[in-house]
């Protein structure tokens, strides 16, 4: 890392800034790595389980919340931080399917990845509707019609889901 800006970038955002004019900043070859500049397989997260593993395009850390993966280089992903709604939604759906002995087959996986559930709506919509029904005018704006639309919404992002565009603007 470079002094000054590099130190600041690392402290603020864990972004490494290297001085490309110095050979000490060249990528090094790690033991076990095929070429220099990459990590060896032993430095990468791997999880083999009988229940499930997942990839939600988020950090490897909670591929399965029952067995968090920890201790890897920060460049691979973060640990101990809040997961994105997409990840949380996926993990909730997996747990719901597996509860009571449910399994995944091709049809269930296809349904799982195309069901268009809006997890933020699942978490927040009931309280939002209760609030706007009790307060149909907010800051001088009548929200009664919007509230009715949200109350009838199926909490999905399907093309015919009337409440979805409105929810995205809330």
Tell where the protein language model's regions lie, with residue ranges.
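Long, compositionally biased non-active-site segments enriched in small/hydrophobic residues and glycine
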Residues: 2-170
């Amino acid at each position: 890392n470079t002094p000054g800006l590099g130190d600041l970038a690392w402290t603020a955002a864990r972004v490494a800034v290297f001085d490309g004019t110095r050979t000490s900043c060249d990528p090094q070859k790690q033991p076990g790595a095929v070429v220099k500049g990459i990590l060896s397989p032993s430095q990468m997260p791997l999880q083999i389980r009988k229940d499930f593993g997942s990839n939600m395009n988020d950090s490897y850390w909670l591929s399965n919340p029952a067995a968090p993966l920890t201790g890897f280089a920060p460049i691979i992903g973060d640990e101990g931080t809040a997961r994105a709604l997409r990840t949380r939604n996926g993990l909730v759906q997996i747990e719901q399917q597996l509860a009571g002995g449910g399994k995944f087959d091709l049809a269930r996986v296809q349904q799982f990845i195309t069901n268009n559930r809006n997890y933020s709506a699942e978490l927040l919509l009931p309280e939002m509707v209760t609030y706007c029904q009790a307060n149909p005018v907010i800051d001088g704006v009548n929200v009664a019609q919007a509230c009715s639309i949200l109350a009838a919404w199926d909490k999905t992002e399907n093309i015919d889901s009337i409440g979805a565009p409105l929810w995205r603007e809330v």
